[in-house]
Each structure stands twice: as structure tokens, then as C-alpha cells.
Amino acid sequence: MAAGVLPQNEQPYSTLVNNSECVANMKGNLERPTPKYTKVGERLRHVIPGHMACSMACGGRACKYENPARWSEQEQAIKGVYSSWVTDNILAMARPSSELLEKYHIIDQFLSHGIKTIINLQRPGEHASCGNPLEQESGFTYLPEAFMEAGIYFYNFGWKDYGVASLTTILDMVKVMTFALQEGKVAIHCHAGLGRTGVLIACYLVFATRMTADQAIIFVRAKRPNSIQTRGQLLCVREFTQFLTPLRNIFSCCDPKAHAVTLPQYLIRQRHLLHGYEARLLKHVPKIIHLVCKLLLDLAENRPVMMKDVSEGPGLSAEIEKTMSEMVTMQLDKELLRHDSDVSNPPNPTAVAADFDNRGMIFSNEQQFDPLWKRRNVECLQPLTHLKRRLSYSDSDLKRAENLLEQGETPQTVPAQILVGHKPRQQKLISHCYIPQSPEPDLHKEALVRSTLSFWSQSKFGGLEGLKDNGSPIFHGRIIPKEAQQSGAFSADVSGSHSPGEPVSPSFANVHKDPNPAHQQVSHCQCKTHGVGSPGSVRQNSRTPRSPLDCGSSPKAQFLVEHETQDSKDLSEAASHSALQSELSAEARRILAAKALANLNESVEKEELKRKVEMWQKELNSRDGAWERICGERDPFILCSLMWSWVEQLKEPVITKEDVDMLVDRRADAAEALFLLEKGQHQTILCVLHCIVNLQTIPVDVEEAFLAHAIKAFTKVNFDSENGPTVYNTLKKIFKHTLEEKRKMTKDGPKPGL
């Protein structure tokens, strides 16, 4: 995008990189992002004729953005073009020209870097007075065919200079980027590669990593200075973030909460987010219904669960963590230097904490959750041994904090106002781990370190402390079968003994020993769940950091020994139970899956089941990676309770009273009745019925219980209510006929897919 008249405080990238003071300011300034132009400058850019703007802003035919001589080698990630790698796979660049393509062999450079897609955000004929003349055939400074003939995909999204696109258009562009990144690296350009390009990349980061808008803007600007220029563009990224929030909501009764929706409304939201094959497959079926039914059949047939390996490679998450950590480190260094130079007049610790709170306000004022780099498990800073290090900290952060801890200068009982950057009304009651404290701690250093490092430790949900994060919600990596999961285990305590797919629950053993009730508060969502808990106890993955709920007031060494001992015990119990469950026959597994669908759980651990379902509800609401991790859940009762709880939390029942009245009035034939409903209703119900059919022969009483429970969930009508018998008899006849017909179709042939 054209930069127009030089933005206020704009400096060339080479100057920013070579000037250490500017680097410190760029990385250390964590204040809310501001526009690069004044209000007057923005207004002028919209009213000055294009040829005059080009002449005044970037030099007309001698356009600086299209002249490689104006940029250092560091500013040319692709030689010959003003360009920067924003991530390892996304290149922001100024527009190339046919002359530059030939002179600098840019297409060959693209291929050598693995760039498979170029996205052009310009309109044909734009900036005709800048740089090299436009190609008459395309209206751009190059011919798109030059890239396409080399096997590089070309996309053009016309976007007005200095302007913004509609939110749905940006979402479509982001989904195209998501698809393109599966093929290889992506290059994006407008005119200068700053404004529109920066907005699109920031929106992609928000979409892919659930960063807040301001975090994404700061990250993009750290990689490509002066990006995202106008007030409208800043607002666009922020509004896009808000636009995505309700679309991502699966369970309206769980954090982050949203208004309840009907089935048709949910399917519309789902279509906004899905793309490609998945969008076509799930056009009329909620993803959670389809996935649970598929997982049930996999469990019943003891098929290996295919899921992505989240532990392979750091990917985008680590790159973002590193960049943001560097920015916080620079801020910490700056404040420590300021403190050392003013020893004679130490500032008030509360003022220091407030200063950091203000600087870091952008990381909590838009959303209260960010699963990418924050330490959800511990709100306080635990002893930083080699077992406790996180990618969220740079080595300098860790060393500095550990030195302070070893000197006894950082007690573990700092008030919540210092620990987190949330405002008081946003803060949640949390549990703390305690270690021996020095008699006279340096409160200023304590506040300084804690306030800076708390950038990483802001929790989004009080009840998510026990969930295993496994890094980023971005899942790069190969598809691998989870051997530990395919062992036929249906119990919660063996659900993925060695799998990253299981949400890990905190142990409450030490909570009951704590006389202080303030250390026992755990947040729960209020979604309705079904059935009773599966047998077994909650296990903790040995690679998962412990929740603060696990910690007593023990010294560091004792804490680590207990940590390792408990992990070994959990693994041993899980292994023995897994061997027992693997002995179930195929018929027994199918019956167990059918009982789960019918909500016939004979276990007595109802609260345990409810708690695990609530954890999955929060997980699905808070991060996209939960769809991958839930494939590791091996308890059919948890899966079915999760599915039915979603059905029952809809604003209106799947089958409304009007639908039932219509079926009764028309005396519809059972074979045709479902087709009288809307397609979303029909396909959703059929998906569940297909699942029970594919479980093959099941006991009559289990099937009857399934039909009764399905009718109750789909209609929200109890059998003993006023119209209950009519509703049940009408739908039971239709459902039974559908099951019989489907069984006839599959009796002598292969089982149809869901």
C-alpha cells in the first residue's frame, strides 16, 4: 500500500534496525497501537488526486517502494523487492514489476524460498503514476501469467488504497490464505506492502492463533515497521476480532459466552469459518455432531485414531512467542536500567505495577483469553528449574527471574493486581504455590519482574488450569495413529495415556488440605451435561505442567519429587486399566457406544463426567486446536454427553412444536417425514441415526432408551408433559422406520459413511 505523505515518526527500516535506541523503543513500547498518520494526513490522502499523491508521497516515476536501490539488503527478503518475512511462511512485499521480475529473477527466488502463492490486494489501474508503467493486459505492473506459468498460484482481491474491506470479505481472504499455506509459503502485496497487506496478515494471525487485535498489530509492526497505517485499518483488525468471537462460540453457556442461537443460525456461523472439503461435507450438519458420531464408530470398531502430532516443530506459535518475548525483554531491561540509575529514590512498588499494567493493558482489554503464549497453569512464578522452563520466556527472562528467586527476592504471594494485567473487575480468584520467602524482599524488583512476566501468565478461564495446552492451536505436522489410544480403552483414565489429545484435569488432592478457601476456587461453566461419570480416576500427563491446585506449601525440591512421583503413579494406573479395557469384544464395544448414545451410564461418578464435559466445552470454545485434541478422547460417555449438551443448549429445539404439529396434521408417511423438515434439521437427525445403525445389532432395550433420549434432546419435551405422548409416539415411529430402512440398506453391502 502506498505510504502517502511520510507518516508521522516514520523512519526507514534500515534506520530502525541499525539504531539500538529505536530498536529498544520499537520492542519495548507495548502501548496500544496508534495510526501512522495524523487525522489531517489521512484526510488529505483521500481527497488529493492520485497522480499528485504519488508524486508527493513516494516520488512518482521514481517511486521509492519500487526502487531496490532505496532499500538495504536486510529490507529485501526477496532481492529486488522491498519485502519482509512476517512469519516463516508469510512474506509482505511491495508490488513487483515486469522489469524487476526479469532483472532480479524474482520468480526463481520465489521458487527457491518455497513460495507457492502470491496474493495481490491492488485494483487494476491503481497507482498508474508510480514507478514502472502498468501492463495494459492486466492493469498491474506485472502479468499474473508470469507467476502462474511457473506453478505459483495467483489471487487478486481488489481493495481500495488506504481503505478497508468488509469483514466477510476479509474472512474469505483469510480462509484462502489458510488453504494457500497448506501448499507452501505465501507472498502478499498491495502497493508498498504496508497498509492493506499488514491488515490482512494481522487478521490472519487473529484467525489462526486467536491473538487479540492489538497483539497481532504489534507483532506485524515488529516484523515490518510502519505497517497498518490508518485509523480505519486499525479499527478493521479490531472489528474483525470481535466479528470472529461469536462465530467461534460452540457452547453459548461457557466462557467466552455468547447469545444462544438456533440450529439454522449455528450452521450459518459454521459456514463462515469452515472452508474447502470440510465446508462442503458439513454444510447442513454441525461439526460437533458429525465428529462425535465418527469418533463413536472408531471406538466401537477399535480403529486407530488419526490425528495431527501437535508436538512436531515449534511452528508459528514459537515464532510469535519469541518475537513478543523479545519485546517484553527489552521493556524489562529498560525498566531495570531505570531502577539502577535511581537507587537513591526508589519508586513506589504500586506505581511500578500500575505503570506496567498500563503498558500491558492491550493484552487484556479486548479478550480475556489468549491460548497462544500465556501460562494458564500457574498464575504465580514457580521455581524456574530446567523442568519448569517455557517457550513463553526468553533465556534472559528465565535467568534474570531465577537469579531473583535464588536470592529470595521474589516471594510467591504477590497480590493479584501485580500478578496479572487485568483490571480488578476482570480478575479471577486463583490458587498460588508458596515457597519460603526472604525476610526483606526487594518489593520494587519483585513488582517489576512479576509485572513484566505476567504478560505471559494472564489466564482466560479460571477453570482451564488443568487442561493440557500442547503449545499453539496451530497444528503443523504429519498424521499419525495414536497407538495408546487404539487399545480399546473406553475409560477416562486411559484416554490417551501418551496422547496430546486428552484434556488433562487438575488433581484436587492438595486442595482439600488447604484451610484457606480462597485457594480452592475453580471456575465452572453451567452447561447441562448428561449421565454419570466413567470409571477411573483423573490422570495427569507427565509432560503436562501441574496446575497450581496441585501445589502445597512445600519447598522446591519436595514439589518436584512429588510432581514426578504422582506422574509415575498415574501412568502406571492408566497402563493397567488400558490392558483391561483392550480385552472387550467388538460386540461389547458397540453396545457400550450405544449405551452412551442412550445415556445409559451405569457408573456412579456423575460429577466426574460433568466436570470433564465442562472442560471440553471450554476447550472447544477457547481454541481451534481442541477439534484435533478431542479425537484423543476415548470415553464414549464423555463424547455423547458433550454432543447432547450441545443439542440441548440451542436457543430452540432441533424439532420445534410447530414441526411436530406439521407432521401430525399431514399424517406424513414415516419414510418421507424427515424430508418435510428443513435440510439442516433432517441431516443433523440423520447423522445421529446413521451412527446407531452402523453400530449394527444392539439390544432392544438400549435402542428404546436411545430413541427416548434422542426425542427428548431434539424436542426439549419430557414424556410426562402435556403433549409428551403425542410428540414421542409421532417421532418414535419416524425414527424407528428410518433405522429399519437404513439397516436393510447396509445389511448386505458396505456400511455407508456418516
Curated annotation (Swiss-Prot):
Composition-biased stretches (Polar residues): 487-498
Lineage: Eukaryota, Metazoa, Chordata, Craniata, Vertebrata
Active site per database record: C190 (phosphocysteine intermediate)
Gene3D superfamilies for this protein: Protein tyrosine phosphatase superfamily
Keyword Phosphoprotein: yes
GO CC term, one of those recorded: cytosol
Gene that produces this protein: PTPDC1
Protein task: May play roles in cilia formation and/or maintenance.
Family label: Belongs to the protein-tyrosine phosphatase family. Non-receptor class PTPDC1 subfamily.
Enzyme Commission identifier(s): 3.1.3.-
Organism of origin: Homo sapiens (Human)
Protein name from the UniProt record: Protein tyrosine phosphatase domain-containing protein 1
Record field: transmembrane: none
Domain Tyrosine-protein phosphatase: from-to ranges: 82-253
